[in-house]
């Protein structure tokens, strides 16, 4: 019984340690130092979005919410390019950009070998682009 309880506590601790997160950040105005970041239109900002989370095989457990950045959610599959792109373009629109160009994305998945290999995965997705008027 104590062994099972210890394992449960260890797994809970690992889940909290690897709790999902999401964020959207931007650099605009003075952060661009007067540089033009696009060949057409007026530069508004460079916007970057990130989401990560813990998965059991392909089932999302604790992930960062793409709907509400900087919060976590349970069971929502938001660690993918589609969800993070929506997060980036939403922020671009909030910054009064009429379009988001030069989108670049990256995804990653890392196996967590404890307690059983190839069961738990840490997934990440990043998208960035330039907001212009």
Give, region by region, the residue ranges found by the protein language model.
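Sec-dependent bacterial lipoprotein signal peptides
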Residues: 1-21
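Bacterial Sec signal peptide processing site at the extreme N-terminus
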Residues: 15-37
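Surface-exposed short loop/turn segments
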Residues: 23-26, 94-133
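Short secondary-structure capping micro-motifs at structural edges
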Residues: 31-35, 89, 114-117
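Short, well-ordered alpha-helical segments
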Residues: 39-110
């Amino acid at each position: 019984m104590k062994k099972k309880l210890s394992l449960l506590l260890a797994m809970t601790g690992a889940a909290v340690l690897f709790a999902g997160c999401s964020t959207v950040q931007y650099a605009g105005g003075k952060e661009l130092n007067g540089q033009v970041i696009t060949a057409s239109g007026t530069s508004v900002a460079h916007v970057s979005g990130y989401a990560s989370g813990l998965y059991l095989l392909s089932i999302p457990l604790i992930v960062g919410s793409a709907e509400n950045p900087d919060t976590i959610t349970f069971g929502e599959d938001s660690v993918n390019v589609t969800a993070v792109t929506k997060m980036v373009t939403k922020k671009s629109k909030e910054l009064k950009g009429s379009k988001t160009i030069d989108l670049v994305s990256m995804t990653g998945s890392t196996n967590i070998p404890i307690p059983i290999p190839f069961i738990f995965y840490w997934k990440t997705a990043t998208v960035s682009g330039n907001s212009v008027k």
